[in-house]
UniProtKB/Swiss-Prot annotation:
Name of the gene: 9
Chain ranges passing through the membrane: none
Family to which the UniProt record says this protein belongs: Belongs to the picovirinae distal tube protein family.
Lineage: Viruses, Duplodnaviria, Heunggongvirae, Uroviricota, Caudoviricetes
Record function comment: Distal (knob) tail protein that plugs the end of the tube before DNA ejection and forms a channel perforating the host membrane during ejection.
One example of a Gene Ontology biological process annotation: symbiont genome ejection through host cell envelope, short tail mechanism
Keywords for this protein: Late protein, Pore-mediated penetration of viral genome into host cell, Viral genome ejection through host cell envelope, Viral penetration into host cytoplasm, Viral short tail ejection system, Viral tail protein, Viral tail tube protein, Virion, Virus entry into host cell
Name the record gives this protein: Tail knob protein gp9
Gene Ontology annotations for the cellular component aspect, listed alphabetically: virus tail, tube
InterPro entries linked: Gp9_C (IPR048710), Gp9_N (IPR031772)
Length: 598
């Protein structure tokens, strides 16, 4: 029980004091004069100049009031002092009224330890469980606060924004990789089968052709150095790749990609792109039977480059809320996806800076591979530029979907081209050996014919090599093999994967999808935070007066010292450990009051 003096003077009994001895709320003052003025302005129920307190020994302090109990029904608070000893005011809760007789009422009370000792105790750094905190910085950016509140926020999100970002808008690249060069460099003579080893990130022997195009089948205007190149349509490019003699069976990979690993200069409105002539050259693939194909040949790339896409303010599109914490994860989340099975979730509060920037990396490899990472995500401010770049790779979306274009292997053309001279030599050999057989040189000549035959001569297998008739059968067998090859359908040696589905449905680049919890839960959590602040879990000085209207404070084993009796001091500690709202404005208990940071 709190300490109670033996007697009091200037006893004043009030009504309409808006807090009680449960200590859920109290009025907080900056000085004793403001405190006295607040209570003294409350409606007075009764005044006693001087009285003795009874029941102190039993722990039930009360005073006898010469007033009917009906006249005291609304009495809820009392203040007094003892002018014989000091001018200190004691503040008390009226706890009970007891009928004595028609003109006398016992009024029971207990000391309000918070108001009585408000200016006699002070906090030391204490473990703060929860309190009202600063929510926004000087630039009106939400301060990071991600401590779990332990509250239900639902199981579903509302999608509030979806934006698609492509490295070069509608521009795409078809990458064709061949075993050898398919064109002649200006001023040189074309040599079929020439291996043109070069640097493509690393030394390698393949030849790379890059063919830019749009989804409508057109191509951009291309400038390489100071030379303009009119690139062929992608359909013309493909048609000729599988008909020209030195291109058929030369192609080892063919795929479509959004980014070739180089931050090229591209004007989307003018549909023009510029390439460095140190890296690329104009390639004209031609033979004497088919139209020329204009495309771009990769000369050399020593190091690839990233491209940065600025998607705008990282908290844009989320519902406005006075509680900054509701912009944090898990209440808000940004998903980056390509809708091809590759996805990362971003906690916006851990993106350094105001804007969400996506870094795109790629290459001209044997298959598609493009990565999308968030710039300066979870990167400490002490990291350097290169270290920041590396750190961002730690959280990346990697699109290594093949995006292949089907490669047709024309078996007939391949066989005829690769074995044309051999076939003619086999025919001559068979005829010669057939004649020699008739002259008696049979089995040795037939054995050489069998050795040179790609088909396997029937007579060779059975040992029948005795006449020119057998030679005719061999030639017929070889021609039948050629006919069989001609009747074989073209084979797909590299399937196209889901390229048609992905690109035909517009699934290119990445999508930035912003999601937040349902409005129902936003309102619940907002109301809770407005009333009780945020979890803090820090050892610090509590925020006792940092808001316009009220501060909630809850501690654990709080460290309070003061010039007062130990019993009351311990009770004050218990009150703050239980949590209390300190009101700075009236009406106390009105949580609709403006409660911005002071």
């Amino acid at each position: 029980m709190a300490y109670v003096p033996l007697s009091g003077t200037d006893v004043r009994i009030f009504s309409n004091v808006p807090f009680s001895n449960d200590y859920k709320s109290t009025r907080w003052f900056t000085n004793a004069d403001a405190q006295y003025s607040y209570f003294n302005a409350k409606p007075r129920v009764h005044v006693i100049n001087e009285c003795n307190f009874v029941g102190l020994k039993e722990g039930t302090p009360h005073i006898r009031v010469n007033k009917r109990i009906d006249d005291l029904y609304n009495a809820c608070y009392m203040i007094f002092r003892n002018t014989q000893y000091s001018n200190k005011w004691f503040y008390c809760f009226v706890t009970r009224l007891e009928y004595v007789n028609s003109g006398v009422t016992n009024l029971y009370f207990e000391i309000d330890v918070i108001q009585t000792w408000m200016f006699d105790f002070k906090f030391q750094p204490s473990y703060i469980v929860r309190e009202h905190q600063e929510m926004w910085d000087a630039n009106n950016e939400p301060l990071t606060n991600t401590i779990d509140e332990g509250l239900n926020y639902g199981t579903e999100y509302d999608v509030v924004a979806v934006e698609q970002y492509k490295p070069y808008g509608d521009l795409m690249f078809m990458v064709c990789i061949s075993k050898s060069k398919m064109h002649a460099t200006a001023g040189e003579t074309f040599k079929a089968g020439e291996i043109a080893a070069n640097i493509n990130g690393a030394p390698q022997p393949l030849s790379y052709y890059v063919h830019p195009f749009y989804e409508d089948g057109s191509s951009p205007k291309v400038t390489i150095g100071s030379n303009e190149v009119q690139v062929s349509k992608p359909t013309d490019f493909l048609k000729n790749m599988f008909t020209q003699e030195h291109a058929v069976n030369n192609i080892v990979s063919l795929y479509v990609t959004d980014y070739i690993g180089l931050n090229i200069h591209y004007d989307e409105s003018a549909k023009t792109m510029s390439l460095r002539d140190t890296m690329f050259e104009h390639a004209q693939i031609a033979d004497d039977k088919h139209p020329n194909v204009n495309t771009i040949y990769l000369k050399e790339v020593k190091e690839y480059e990233e491209k940065t896409i600025d998607t705008g303010y990282k908290f844009a599109s989320f519902a406005n809320n006075e509680q900054s914490k509701l912009l944090m994860y898990p209440y808000c989340v940004t998903t980056i996806t390509d809708f091809k099975g590759n996805q990362i979730d971003i906690k916006n509060e851990y993106v350094n800076g105001s804007n969400l920037k996506i870094q795109v990396r790629g290459s001209l490899g044997v298959s598609n591979k493009v990565t999308y990472s968030v710039q300066d995500y979870n990167a400490d401010t002490t990291l350097s530029g290169d270290q920041n770049l590396t750190a961002s790779c730690n959280t990346s979306l990697i699109n290594n979907n093949p995006n292949d274009v089907a490669i047709i292997n024309d078996y007939l053309s391949a066989y005829l081209q690769g074995n044309k001279n051999s076939l003619e030599n086999q025919k001559d050999s068979i005829l010669f050996n057939g004649v020699m057989s008739m002259l008696g040189n049979g089995i040795g000549a037939v054995g050489s014919a069998a050795t040179g035959s790609a088909v396997g001569v029937a007579s060779s297998a059975t040992g029948m090599v005795s006449s020119a008739g057998n030679a005719v059968l061999q030639i017929q067998g070889m021609q039948a093999k050629q006919a069989d090859i001609a009747n074989t359908p073209p084979q797909l040696v590299k399937m196209g994967g889901n390229t048609a589905y992905d690109y035909g449905n517009g699934y290119r680049g990445v999508y930035v999808i912003k999601k937040q919890i349902k409005e129902e839960y936003r309102n619940i959590l907002s109301d809770f935070s407005r009333k009780y602040g945020y979890k803090t879990n820090l050892v610090k000085m509590p925020n006792l007066r940092t808001r316009e209207s009220y501060n909630y404070v809850q501690t654990k084993d709080c460290n309070i010292i003061g010039n007062l009796n130990n019993e009351d001091l311990q009770k004050i500690r218990t009150i703050f450990d239980s949590g209390i709202t300190l009101w700075h404005a009236d009406p106390v208990g009105d949580y609709t009051l403006n409660n911005e940071v002071r």
